[in-house]
Amino acid sequence: RLIEYGEEHPIEILLVDESSRALVGDVKAEQVMVLCDGELVDGPDIFPAIYKYQSGDCIMREVLASYCSRPVEPALALLGSRALVVGIYSPVNRCFKSSLALTIGQVMAKKESVLYLNLEEYSGFTRLINSEYKADLSDVLYLYRQGGYNWMKLKSMISNWGNMDFIPPVRYAEDLSQVAPEDMAQLIDRIARESGYDRLVVDVGQMGRGALPVLSMCNVVYMPVREDYISAAKIEEFEEYLEEADDAGVRDRIQKLRLPRHTGIAKQEGY
């Protein structure tokens, strides 16, 4: 029946177990992958092997990663409108910026498809959700610099937390410093245009004046602020910079937020 189906319908990926491995020779499939139990099997037909005793999300990421290792169309993308890019940024420290970004992402994800992107040097994200990842934003940036980026490859690096999808943050802080702010902005724009998500939430790190190109890609920028004298001085200095840069577009999209102070979250379980 599968052979007949392959004659009439294109099969891009065929995922089989080891017991069916010898039976797929007559099936017309672009790529065959084998679910294995950990032992290497020799044979004339060498198919990519995927360890089957792992979570479904991990299996799916390995399938997509293997599929994307083949040459693909450079312009491969999901059709649809550009995602609304929501930036979370503040020149003020310890203002619950990342808490706000994660909350906005989870709330939006209840009704829309959301992708969360963290651009901080030290996000603490993997410890927050107690998970480790084989691929992260460092790999995305490498692909983009090498000209090998496309949406299918990015999809293999995306994980899920609650209702929200996310790209795991960089492993090493220096990976962010090796990317020009303009290139980062172009990457964000490309993800927004090609990913098929409704919303792209970007937690913008302390990029100095390099944050401006990234903020320019955002449809709206939420800026948590504090009312103490030092924080107010930082906000005023940032606004003066926007005036000097003559970037009314970014200035008009900024919405300042004064968040309630909370001290009850002391452990990762609180999130």
What is each PLM-predicted segment?
Residues 1-25, 206-207:
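A short, well-structured beta->alpha microelement
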Residues 10-12, 29-30, 164, 197-198, ...:
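Local beta-strand N-terminus motif with an aromatic residue
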Residues 14, 32, 49, 200, ...:
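Short, well-ordered beta-strand core segments
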Residues 16, 23, 27-85:
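Extreme N-terminal, non-catalytic leader segments
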Residues 19-23, 39-41, 93-96, 172-179, ...:
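Short acidic, S/G/P-rich loop/turn micro-motifs used as interaction or catalytic elements
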Residues 57-62, 186-271:
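Conserved catalytic-core segment of NTP-binding enzymes
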Residues 85-148, 203-204:
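Walker A/P-loop NTP-binding active-site region of P-loop NTPases
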Residues 119-193:
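P-loop/Walker-type NTP enzyme "switch/lid" segment
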